[in-house]
Amino acid sequence: MSKNLTTRAEDYSKWYNELVVRADLAENSGVRGCMVIKPYGYAIWEKMQAELDRMFKETGHSNAYFPLFVPKSMFEAEEKNAEGFAKECAIVTHYRLKNDPDKPGKLMVDPNAKLEEELIVRPTSEAIIWSTYKGWIQSYRDLPLLINQWANVVRWEMRTRLFLRTAEFLWQEGHTAHATRKEAIEESEKMMNVYADFAQNFMAIPVIKGLKTETERFAGAEETYCIEALMQDGKALQAGTSHFLGQNFAKAFDVKFANAEGKQEHVWGTSWGVSTRLMGALVMTHSDDNGLVLPPNLAPIQVVIVPIFKTDEEFEKISALANDLISQFKKLNISVKFDNRTTQKPGFKFAEWELKGVPVRIAIGPKDLENETFEIARRDTLTKEVKPKEGIVKYISDLLAQIQSDLFSKALQYRDTHITEVSDFEEFKKVLENKGGFISAHWDGTPETEEKIKELTKATIRCIALNRKEEIGNCMFTGKQSVGRVLFAKAY
């Protein structure tokens, strides 16, 4: 099996696009800007879903489902949110087709089936959910209300890329209501921390926790918390956001509760979400010129066993050994595949599973039967070693944990060596052009300066890091006083 991938050094963007398709993760569809997530790619998303869903439930959230369609009048109730998403909305105006009298066999929109009110295909669900919460919340005893939804949303993107930016994508969106400002802020921070925990412990991706600037903040939020990751090409990727909504949506939809004294108050809200964009982050953080590199905690197949044989007798003996290994792996919840296809040679199988990023490969041939050994190959380092049969399951279990840890350490080292402090704009432009990564610089706090820097360099403020140190300085662009550094980068 010839991989022949474009290398990252040749063309990083082309490498990514080829890899997503060649590794059977996803492909473009017949609908502009929409993708087909293939079974192998969806299996990774399912593992992500399962872990996140567990984490949400452990923090007290329940799943629900709300309509795909939002009446236009409802959508525009919270003005900032409506304005922020207006240019990306798909709109349903009619509810029926009919045969076209001028074109036999063709259909046309029935002009008599116009909706009284247009329906927006949800780009996000705050409007429909908060209009529902009005009927669910009457008293402080109904709070907090902690709801999550797994759904698809539509944002009519003009420039699309598989997983990173598509017109339709899968995601989860949490929407919570609280009795106090303090509780809502704590919820926003908690969910940012849940996302960071997931990124680091399952995706093996180090992230920076921070706050978005006013310009980058979610439309309709008072504060947006985020986690920012760095890809191998030195570009940042926003991996998750958690918004403190204040009382904006509660006031827009008149969601009130009677407090302990019987007085009516508006509730306080949050919303938070991650999407299939995480799939793109996973691919770009760890993969190499040979294909995918998957962290064991999210790999659909953690171990693949490839038999090498010439006779039916050898194949039967290897199969018996492999099936014994499989039953032992399953007891440890290690997902394993025995690639016993007789239509492909071992070399083809090695290349295929390398391309698909399976963390560990076990090869068993006639010599291994004779010597009671196995050849073990690591996908992340491409190293091989021969190990005795005795204790092999425990060894591989430990090896998977080591690979998970090593992938995180490698990504962390890359990230940390690509955070550069600069003091003036000329230095900023040089680092951005020649090195990339996060650039730590003083900023005067104004949207005007932020916009001008973006216009000149295409770099944006990714976040105001929560762990930044207090440091008075001067804005690298205007020279005005600054109270602390922020992180700039070019981004996906």
From Swiss-Prot:
Classification via InterPro entries: aa-tRNA-synt_IIb (IPR002314), aa-tRNA-synth_II (IPR006195), aa-tRNA-synth_II/BPL/LPL (IPR045864), Anticodon-bd (IPR004154), Anticodon-bd_dom_sf (IPR036621), Pro-tRNA-ligase_IIa_arc-type (IPR004499), Pro-tRNA_ligase_II_C (IPR016061), Pro-tRNA_synth_II (IPR017449)
Gene Ontology terms describing biological process: prolyl-tRNA aminoacylation
Keyword Nuclease: no
Coiled coil regions, renumbered to chain: none
Subcellular location: Cytoplasm
Domain of life: Bacteria
This enzyme's EC code(s): 6.1.1.15
Swiss-Prot/TrEMBL keywords: Aminoacyl-tRNA synthetase, ATP-binding, Cytoplasm, Ligase, Nucleotide-binding, Protein biosynthesis
Main location (coarse class): cytoplasm
Comment text on domains: Consists of three domains: the N-terminal catalytic domain, the anticodon-binding domain and the C-terminal extension.
Quaternary context: Homodimer.
Known function: Catalyzes the attachment of proline to tRNA(Pro) in a two-step reaction: proline is first activated by ATP to form Pro-AMP and then transferred to the acceptor end of tRNA(Pro).
Protein name in the entry: Proline--tRNA ligase
Organism (species): Flavobacterium psychrophilum (strain ATCC 49511 / DSM 21280 / CIP 103535 / JIP02/86)
Gene from which the chain derives: proS
